[in-house]
Swiss-Prot record:
Residues 83-200 form the GST C-terminal domain. Glutathione binds at residues 8, 41, 45, 52-53, 65-66. Residues 2-81 form the GST N-terminal domain. This is Glutathione S-transferase P 10.
Length: 210
């Protein structure tokens, strides 16, 4: 199998879930990053299926849409649960996390509500539901003690919210413990520490970095 190529921007954004999955599982990949406003991206965009990123190219196939990429990698690398029931639960959890992300996006890019609203109401109200859903399976991860593709989006989004407010996870001990465990994973820790030190932007604008 050829080394997969991941195309995304120089920010964390939606591409970061995919990077984390590759890194944590020791899967070699090319991490190709475009400047959001650069000419290189504008030219590359013209030849793409839907004209958007992230894009994963593997064995001649171009896969776009974040969810499609993550589920593909989940199936290929044994990160999609052990049966249809678990796979469906992961699907549900993944989409639930993305719904929370879109609430955050509306604050970041469209100034919907204040930072205080986002930190004290919008995100916490959603995390209450995710905390309960996480508890449906006992163990360190979403479906027990085996990591899945959905754990990477959950971790990244929790980290994004923690950057926004360092205390935001304190009322959600199960999710906070999960977030702390993920930070300590051997294949992720050095990358995460460097990302933090380099202050890699989460979004296409600086908003959300403090």
């Amino acid at each position: 199998m050829a080394v997969p190529q991941l195309y995304y921007f120089t920010i964390r954004g939606f591409g970061e879930y995919i990077r984390l999955l590759f890194l944590d599982n020791g899967i070699k990949f090319e991490d190709i990053r475009f400047d959001y406003e650069g000419n290189e991206w504008q030219e590359f965009k013209k030849g793409m299926l839907l004209g958007q990123l992230p894009c994963l190219k593997v064995d001649g196939q171009e896969i776009v849409q974040t969810g499609a990429i993550m589920r593909h990698l989940g199936r290929v690398h044994g990160l999609n649960g052990s049966n249809e029931q678990e796979a469906t639960f992961l699907d549900m959890f993944f989409e639930g996390v993305r719904d929370v992300r879109m609430k955050y996006v509306r604050y970041i890019y469209y100034d919907e509500g204040t930072r205080e609203d986002c930190v004290n109401k919008t995100i916490p109200e959603a995390l209450v539901k995710l905390e309960e859903l996480f508890k449906a399976h006992s163990g360190d991860f979403i479906i027990g003690n085996k990591i899945s593709y959905a754990d990477y989006i959950l971790f990244e989004e929790l980290d994004v919210y923690h950057v926004l407010d360092a205390n935001i996870l304190d009322k959600f001990p199960t999710l906070k413990s999960f977030w702390e465990r993920m930070w300590k994973r051997p294949n992720l820790n050095a990358y995460l520490e460097k990302r933090k030190a380099d202050k890699v932007w989460i979004n296409a604008i600086e908003k959300g970095m403090n």
